[in-house]
């Protein structure tokens, strides 16, 4: 039996593309396992999918001087030893890495054991983890064509983002039934990512009096960010996090307000949902979400509102502009060349072990 180990973590965006590929490999006689951190969100998502999971020590390397770098280097070194032990025992034919700091010791360990590594980069510019990991990998995939310049030309293919099959198979009627929403009123989906988005949550809730006059709102606000005072509010449903309901909510959505994580926005592109992207600011990130958003705006798939300019007034204005021009955005997405990367990547993995 062919064997593969996946790695990736830190946020759902580093995990769900792996799950999309795993779903396909499950039908192709593969033995599958996953290496992630002890307590990261990846553990919850992977174990829920019924995949064997190995936790290792993980640390974050920062782009600035910090004493935590010293202790985190020790954690990464320990993670390398743990990953190497797991790989020696499991003897996978190939490792697939999706990014996040937990992946660095895993792909380094695979390199020392001469196990081929396939690596996918979702963002327009690679994160630090993938910049470190690329020296240990053999095959590279990117979501954006521009990203390929950061990896070896002969070993890199632009494939788009791996999208879970089930996300494309939801039911609009079921989504509206779950929320008890009307079929006649437009539905606005708000997603701040698996960890939530405080500023977006605040702006949405400050705008409810205005927005709910036009829209019914599905607000996925992140763990610990529910507002009990808003339970039972007309045309408004809030959720910390959703899993089984998500495909149905996506089909029910006429518009989406979202962060600029690559995997999420490629999912909305595949579903042809007009987007208002509010990327993480440069003060909170390396600016990758801003670049992702700018590319989608340039291609006509989305509008963008920088977090520094986010108020209830600017949010309401941008949502209305998006709704007014929704058909233009849908037509641009219909004409896009974006494809689901899952089929291509699974074929390459099959070829790797032949």
UniProtKB/Swiss-Prot annotation:
According to UniProt, this protein's pathway is:
Cell wall biogenesis; peptidoglycan biosynthesis
Q: Has keyword Cell cycle?
A: yes
Q: Which Pfam families match?
A: Glyco_tran_28_C, Glyco_transf_28
**CC annotations in GO:** plasma membrane
Positions with a binding annotation for UDP-N-acetyl-alpha-D-glucosamine: 11-13, 164, 194, 289
GO terms in the biological process aspect are:
carbohydrate metabolic process; cell division; cell wall organization; lipid glycosylation; peptidoglycan biosynthetic process; regulation of cell shape
Report the locations given in the UniProt record. Answer: Cell membrane
SUPFAM superfamilies registered for this protein in UniProt: UDP-Glycosyltransferase/glycogen phosphorylase
Give me the reactions it catalyses: di-trans,octa-cis-undecaprenyl diphospho-N-acetyl-alpha-D-muramoyl-L-alanyl-D-glutamyl-meso-2,6-diaminopimeloyl-D-alanyl-D-alanine + UDP-N-acetyl-alpha-D-glucosamine = di-trans,octa-cis-undecaprenyl diphospho-[N-acetyl-alpha-D-glucosaminyl-(1->4)]-N-acetyl-alpha-D-muramoyl-L-alanyl-D-glutamyl-meso-2,6-diaminopimeloyl-D-alanyl-D-alanine + UDP + H(+)
Q: What class of enzyme is it?
A: transferase
Q: Which UniProt key words apply to this protein?
A: Cell cycle, Cell division, Cell membrane, Cell shape, Cell wall biogenesis/degradation, Glycosyltransferase, Membrane, Peptidoglycan synthesis, Transferase
- Role this protein plays: Cell wall formation. Catalyzes the transfer of a GlcNAc subunit on undecaprenyl-pyrophosphoryl-MurNAc-pentapeptide (lipid intermediate I) to form undecaprenyl-pyrophosphoryl-MurNAc-(pentapeptide)GlcNAc (lipid intermediate II).
The protein's name in its UniProt record: UDP-N-acetylglucosamine--N-acetylmuramyl-(pentapeptide) pyrophosphoryl-undecaprenol N-acetylglucosamine transferase
Q: Which organism is it from?
A: Shouchella clausii (strain KSM-K16) (Alkalihalobacillus clausii)
């Amino acid at each position: 039996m062919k064997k593969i180990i996946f790695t990736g973590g830190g946020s759902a965006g580093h995990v769900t593309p792996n799950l999309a590929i795993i779903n396909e490999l499950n039908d192709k006689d593969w033995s599958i396992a996953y290496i992630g951190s002890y307590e990261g969100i990846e553990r919850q998502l992977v174990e829920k999918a019924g995949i064997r999971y190995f936790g290792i020590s993980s640390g974050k390397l920062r782009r600035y001087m910090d004493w935590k770098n010293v202790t985190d280097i020790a954690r990464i070194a320990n993670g390398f030893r743990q990953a190497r032990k797991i790989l020696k025992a499991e003897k996978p034919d190939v490792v697939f890495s999706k990014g996040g700091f937990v992946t660095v010791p895993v792909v380094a360990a695979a390199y020392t054991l001469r196990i081929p590594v396939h690596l996918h980069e979702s963002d327009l510019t690679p994160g630090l983890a993938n910049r470190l990991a690329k020296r240990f990998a053999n095959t590279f995939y990117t979501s954006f064509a521009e990203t390929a310049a950061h990896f070896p030309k002969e070993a890199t293919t632009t494939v788009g983002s791996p999208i879970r099959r089930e996300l494309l198979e939801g039911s609009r009627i079921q989504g509206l039934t779950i929320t008890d929403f009307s079929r006649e009123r437009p539905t606005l989906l708000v997603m701040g990512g698996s960890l939530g988005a405080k500023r977006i949550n605040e702006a949405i809730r400050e705008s409810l009096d205005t927005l709910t006059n036009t829209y019914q709102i599905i607000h996925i606000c992140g763990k610990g960010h529910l507002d009990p005072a808003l339970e039972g509010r007309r045309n408004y449903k809030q959720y910390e996090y959703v899993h089984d309901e998500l495909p149905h909510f996506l089909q029910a959505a006429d518009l989406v307000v979202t962060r600029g994580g690559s995997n999420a926005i490629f999912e909305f592109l595949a579903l042809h949902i007009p987007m208002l992207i509010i990327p993480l600011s440069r003060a909170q990130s390396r600016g990758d979400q801003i670049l992702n958003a700018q590319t989608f705006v340039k291609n006509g798939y989305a509008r963008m509102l920088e977090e520094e300019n986010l108020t209830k007034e600017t949010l309401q204005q941008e949502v209305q502009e998006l709704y007014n021009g929704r058909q233009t955005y849908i037509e641009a997405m219909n004409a896009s060349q974006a494809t689901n990367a899952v089929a291509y990547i699974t074929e390459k993995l099959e070829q790797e072990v032949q």
